[in-house]
Swiss-Prot record:
It is found in: Plastid, Chloroplast. Binds 5S rRNA, forms part of the central protuberance of the 50S subunit. Part of the 50S ribosomal subunit; contacts the 5S rRNA. This is Large ribosomal subunit protein uL5c. GO terms for molecular function: rRNA binding; structural constituent of ribosome.
Amino acid sequence: MSQPLKEKYKSEIVPNLIKTFGYKNIHQVPKITKIQINRGLGAAASNNSTLQQTIEEIRIITGQQPIVTMAKKSIAGFKLRENQPLGVTVTLRNTLMFSFLERLINLVLPRVRDFNGLNPNGFDQHGNYNFGLDNQLVFPEISYESVDQQRGFNITIVTTAKTQVEGFNLLQSYGFPFKKN
């Protein structure tokens, strides 16, 4: 299976980042290591059908079975019981990661309503990028009829970048549409 983003990384992105940042070794060049997708269920966590629908939606979107995250201990103030489902998470690496990135950049982000670009302030101090999508219907795999309620999720792109600037340049080289400040 062809992976255009992986080939683009090797042929275009690595030489550009070496020239921009003056890396001495090819292994110093930052790369994307994994993508984590999380959805918290909130009050709907007690509803088993909502949990099953969320698992199925995330599985369809990512191509990988998600893990249900459970509460570690009871907290009465939040009406939370131990081992109660809180949400779902999935970690994508290698082939599935590049496949998801390709669809995210080329199909999903252009379909987001009133999209002006991703916020460049979503980077942490280590060059990882976090952002959220408000609606699962922007993914072409999800049909409108199968959705009972619109729910968003968080996407974390973990990189080996050491700084925010390196992470920003890496993702911008991949084609992420960031807002102009």
